[in-house]
Amino acid sequence: NKMLDIKFVRENPEVVKQNIRNKFQDNKLELVDKVLELDKENREIKQEVEALRAERNKISKQIGALMGQGKKEEAEEVKKQVAASGTRIEELSAREKEVEEEIKKIMMVIPNIIDPSVPIGKDDSENVEAERFGEPVVPDFEIPYHTDIMESFDGIDLDAAREVAGNGFYYLMGDIARLHSAILSYARDFMIDRGFTYCVPPFMIHGNVVNGVMSFAEMESMMYKIEGEDLYLIGTSEHSMIGKFIDSIIPEEKLPLTLTSYSPCFRKEKGAHGIEERGVYRIHQFEKQEMVVVCKPEDSMMWYDKLWKNTVDLFRSMDIPVRTLECCSGDLADLKVKSVDVEAWSPRQKKYFEVGSCSNLGDAQARRLKIRVNGEDGKKYLAHTLNNTVVAPPRMLIAFLENNLNADGTVSIPEVLRMYMGGKEKLVPKH
């Protein structure tokens, strides 16, 4: 259960250490030396056990012969030797278990090797803009705060939600609720048209799946646990979609698996940001259309580019300008090889904000969950996994409403969404 192969660490300790430095996690450097010592001990134990077993088998064969020759005392001597090496083997095996447990623990926190193209930086403030799509226009009229736009359509009730569930929840109503669902339905069909298989997965998963798809640090800040049960609410359908392939061997000719899943998502949002602002920007519950790919290692970078481009195309089809942002080394979660955020333009704030994230996890999740491929030559190898947001309202409704708002307070419905909105071409405010 780890991100890297111990063999890789053994053969490339400096690469592993430099990668840790690049991620500004220097407190983990000593773990590399520690795990290599444990690995050495583990291999020595294995050799010793093997030698003892061979020796024991050899001498136990003498017992019968000695008894047959009436050499009883000598036979007893040999029996004692056999018993002693049996005890020693047991001691060694117990230690071996301990050592392997410790190795596993350390390997769980040694980060995956990032792609050489990833910019080096401490945190998300050092992410690098890659490309812009669509003109980030600021209109010549005042754009209200997103909840005020929603309220003009009687579309949101945050006060009632706070009474019922606390901060970070919302009631969406009327046209705004319908818009929320329409965008998800459109996103689903958009991905089906691009050849992805639609899937509705479990919205809760066991702890072993949680450990397989994310680092412990991520789990602590995101996941809600169901009291008294081995169940967690998913933070994204990626969790249950990757979990679907736990302990499996996929025939190579079945690859790539290209899936698009829908689910509600639940997040504690513990940590740096918390939930401070009024509205639907940072919330405990949202809905998401997701894409997940399981593919051959040599194809994962090609799929990575295809995935984020899908999101860009989708947002552009709804008249929302976007940009891509390369995540720097310090901002990358420990399992990720490379990641890009898709950000939508907010004409009200005159800046871009995150609406999706595309990641290549290399074989990190596959290693933890044992997702293997049966190659043409009969050799088994680990698959690569990727995930990307198609769309995750209600946060992206902020960008949708701001970019499609007109001076008279109406909101234009882009053509692609009209069939999901009962043919409406625009939303007209109630007050």
Task: Put a short name on every predicted segment.
Residues L29, R132-H431:
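TRNA-recognition modules of translation machinery and tRNA-sensing kinases, especially anticodon-binding
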Residues N1-M3, K430-H431:
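Short, Lys/Arg-enriched, disordered terminal segments
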Residues K2-P136, E151, G155:
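N-terminal alpha-helical targeting/anchoring segments
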